[in-house]
Amino acid sequence: MKFTIQKDRLVESVQDVLKAVSSRTTIPILTGIKIVASDDGVSFTGSDSDISIESFIPKEEGDKEIVTIEQPGSIVLQARFFSEIVKKLPMATVEIEVQNQYLTIIRSGKAEFNLNGLDADEYPHLPQIEEHHAIQIPTDLLKNLIRQTVFAVSTSETRPILTGVNWKVEQSELLCTATDSHRLALRKAKLDIPEDRSYNVVIPGKSLTELSKILDDNQELVDIVITETQVLFKAKNVLFFSRLLDGNYPDTTSLIPQDSKTEIIVNTKEFLQAIDRASLLAREGRNNVVKLSAKPAESIEISSNSPEIGKVVEAIVADQIEGEELNISFSPKYMLDALKVLEGAEIRVSFTGAMRPFLIRTPNDETIVQLILPVRTY
């Protein structure tokens, strides 16, 4: 195998597939990156058997030549060393050549590295997925769906199913749900698919986070193929495979209150900054909570009290307060996480009592809902 490639594209592809490579793997060859040079271009693959990423660099794009292939072939190189080497090479082009016994030479300018490679035939095959019935979602929408839900997945392995995001497709609508049983994030999106197609799968939160880092912010369509055990995301020149989590995701529809006793509408930025300030003292206290008091026709008060340190009280003018008087305590971290993913100058918070879950939404937008469980402080 021998080819010459543009360094910037090489670095980009290697960084993408590196996201799937784990140093803690039971299969030693998976600590490497598989490189295959063919007549069409060069592909790079990284995998930890849960996530597999393949990045393809075509020979040319438009009229610009990116790769020159002198001899097709394949090799597996140690990911950690290879990724560091290509980043630090001096020139704009890199030549990679495999000689006898899988010895690989990497040249750029006057720098030359010799790396011991492994036989690419020993590398596990990527999952074979039949690509009929793909769902298509614009890249920017897909990134939003992930960003607005994945932060709420559980980080604890006690209920593994909650470490993933539930993707449910029915009646041409996708519903993404994530919860760690203290909070819940929900996002809906319309899909351009037949109404009778339905799916209900749980994608690991880690997979979605890594996928989001690889995708560019553009409107190009991503093809999504869902099977019994795997999901494949096909973007431009990138294939991203992830295993699905086993088990049934809990039904969360009953958690969402249908009516409310107190409703407030406030400026998102002012509310977020006030919670952020109150959390400065809450962080130190044992009971990491912020208290919100709302009186109709008056303002909202945000406070936090840490006996060892002191206390903070701040009043915010609400655009609207309706319903009953309310005192409620909650985790400032959960509230900040939810506020950061809502897009809009104002937010509507609906409470159904001091010990009941409450909802945070943007007025006039039903596609995204954040739910938080309050904290008992007595």
Curated annotation (Swiss-Prot):
One of its GO terms (biological process) is DNA strand elongation involved in DNA replication. InterPro entries: DNA_clamp_sf, DNA_polIII_beta, DNA_polIII_beta_C, DNA_polIII_beta_cen, DNA_polIII_beta_N. Induction: Part of the dnaA-dnaN operon, which is negatively regulated by DnaA. Transcription seems to often terminate between the 2 genes. GO terms for molecular function: 3'-5' exonuclease activity; DNA binding; DNA-directed DNA polymerase activity. SMART domains: POL3Bc (SM00480). Keywords: Cytoplasm, DNA replication, DNA-binding, DNA-directed DNA polymerase, Nucleotidyltransferase, Transferase. Pfam families: DNA_pol3_beta (PF00712), DNA_pol3_beta_2 (PF02767), DNA_pol3_beta_3 (PF02768). CDD domains: beta_clamp (cd00140). GO terms for cellular component: cytoplasm; DNA polymerase III complex; nucleoid. Gene3D superfamilies: 3.70.10.10, DNA Polymerase III, subunit A, domain 2 (3.10.150.10). It comes from the Bacteria. Its main location: cytoplasm. SUPFAM superfamilies: DNA clamp (SSF55979). It is found in: Cytoplasm, Nucleoid. Confers DNA tethering and processivity to DNA polymerases and other proteins. Acts as a clamp, forming a ring around DNA (a reaction catalyzed by the clamp-loading complex) which diffuses in an ATP-independent manner freely and bidirectionally along dsDNA. Initially characterized for its ability to contact the catalytic subunit of DNA polymerase III (Pol III), a complex, multichain enzyme responsible for most of the replicative synthesis in bacteria; Pol III exhibits 3'-5' exonuclease proofreading activity. PANTHER family: BETA SLIDING CLAMP, DNA POLYMERASE III SUBUNIT BETA. Forms a ring-shaped head-to-tail homodimer around DNA which binds and tethers DNA polymerases and other proteins to the DNA. The DNA replisome complex has a single clamp-loading complex (3 tau and 1 each of delta, delta', psi and chi subunits) which binds 3 Pol III cores (1 core on the leading strand and 2 on the lagging strand) each with a beta sliding clamp dimer. Additional proteins in the replisome are other copies of gamma, psi and chi, Ssb, DNA helicase and RNA primase. Interacts with YabA, and via YabA, with DnaA. During sporulation probably interacts with SirA. NCBIfam families: dnan. Belongs to the beta sliding clamp family. This is Beta sliding clamp. It comes from Bacillus subtilis (strain 168). The lineage of its organism: Bacteria, Bacillati, Bacillota, Bacilli, Bacillales. The gene is dnaN.
